[in-house]
Amino acid sequence: MILGTGIDIVEVPRIAQSIQRFGDRFLGRIYTPAEIRYCQSKANAVERFAARFAAKEAAMKAIGTGMRGGVTWHDFEVGREPGGRPTMVFHGKAAQVAQGLGGRRAHLSVSHTEQYAVASVILED
């Protein structure tokens, strides 16, 4: 059964501006070390960062918290299965909230271009 859904769209140039202006401080506040390593290893790193930003926002919507109740950006981590399929992993307070809702699985879909990144998360029991 679907317990929650979330979707978000991000303007890639906005993320590029934040990275340019705040550098490692921005990256470290939003992304986990593994996410930073992955994105920086790709030619289109800014698009990848934007897609992960959108995924984290979508996940916040799927569990219904936003950035309230002790939930942080690092509570949501985008990974990849060996075949390339994106995954959403909940940590800390976000994991507690998702489990409290009965959530056992999060489905993530992301897409990005030079201008936009979009992500959708479905929380399922």
UniProtKB/Swiss-Prot annotation:
It catalyses: apo-[ACP] + CoA = holo-[ACP] + adenosine 3',5'-bisphosphate + H(+). Keywords: Cytoplasm, Fatty acid biosynthesis, Fatty acid metabolism, Lipid biosynthesis, Lipid metabolism, Magnesium, Metal-binding, Transferase. Its cofactor is Mg(2+). GO terms for molecular function: holo-[acyl-carrier-protein] synthase activity; magnesium ion binding. Its EC number is 2.7.8.7. GO terms for biological process: fatty acid biosynthetic process. It comes from the Bacteria. GO terms for cellular component: cytoplasm. Mg(2+) binds at D8, E57. It is found in: Cytoplasm. Transfers the 4'-phosphopantetheine moiety from coenzyme A to a Ser of acyl-carrier-protein. Belongs to the P-Pant transferase superfamily. AcpS family. This is Holo-[acyl-carrier-protein] synthase. It comes from Koribacter versatilis (strain Ellin345). The gene is acpS.
